[in-house]
Amino acid sequence: MPEPTMPDDLVRLWRLRNGPRLGRPAELDIDRVVDTAVRLADEGGLVAATLPKIAAALSVTPMSLYRHIGSKEELIGLMADAAMGPAPDCSSEATAEPNAHHATGGTATRGDATESASPAWRPALREWAVAQSEVFRRRPWLAQLPVTGPPRGPNAIAWMDAGLRALRETGLDWAAKIGVITVVGGYVRQAFTLDRQLAESRGAANVDERQALRRYVRELTAVVDAGRFPDVTALLGSGLFESVPDAPESADQDFAFGLDLVLDGVAAAVER
């Protein structure tokens, strides 16, 4: 029975050869196309990485790009894998010390106390999550890309392997491990997306986080009925929104708190 043919897009994603190369190397190749696309996206977001703009940056025609990337959809997958970069070393040996401070800019959080006495998987999985968050901060456009299936590219597979390696000693079965890294990765992506959208909204309104929250309290206090919404009324009158730290610190604290909640859920699954 003949072996199945490997899909062309997978060949390109893994930079595999379909036979020997003859003659001089081509002036344009898949790496140049993808590197240029990533650079343009880094500089101006996804709108800056269209095929015409990539072609212009490479001094070629847009149609010539299709010999190297297959389709616009395939280019997105190639960009995503390249932009994620190498995975971190999330083995228990590499994360023997608590790593919560990475997620909070050095600010102590509840994670600092819990990590010091936690099993090896917890700081390792935390480091994996924090590393993903740092990638999104460097390349916000990555969080805008659609999720079309499980990891396929070499970098994406390396990240998946690192997440699974963090959970190696937990005793969880494979389905549970995949579930854990999917939930943790989903939290990282959603937390970043929410924070960025709120920041963009405040920027459009020309207000900072403190001003936005004070306006929120003022406006909602005027319309929320205590009899109908007693707990929201109590929240609005608690003064919580009057003591918001600077935006970067606030976002870091929110991320660390949410990640702790997710990791607590993982711990409960591990201990069952």
Put a short name on every predicted segment.
Residues 1-17, 197-272:
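C-terminal peripheral helix-coil segments that are non-catalytic and often amphipathic
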Residues 32-39, 43, 74-90, 123-131, ...:
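Alpha-helical structural segments
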Residues 79, 83, 87, 188-192, ...:
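Hydrophobic recognition helices of helix-based DNA-binding modules
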Residues 1-53, 57, 70-74, 107:
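Basic, helix-initiating cap at the start of DNA-binding domains
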Residues 162-211, 215-219:
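A contiguous pocket-lining binding segment that forms or flanks enzyme active sites
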Residues 59-69:
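Short hydrophobic/aromatic patch on the recognition helix
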Residues 90-158, 174-177, 181-184:
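Hydrophobic alpha-helical connector segments
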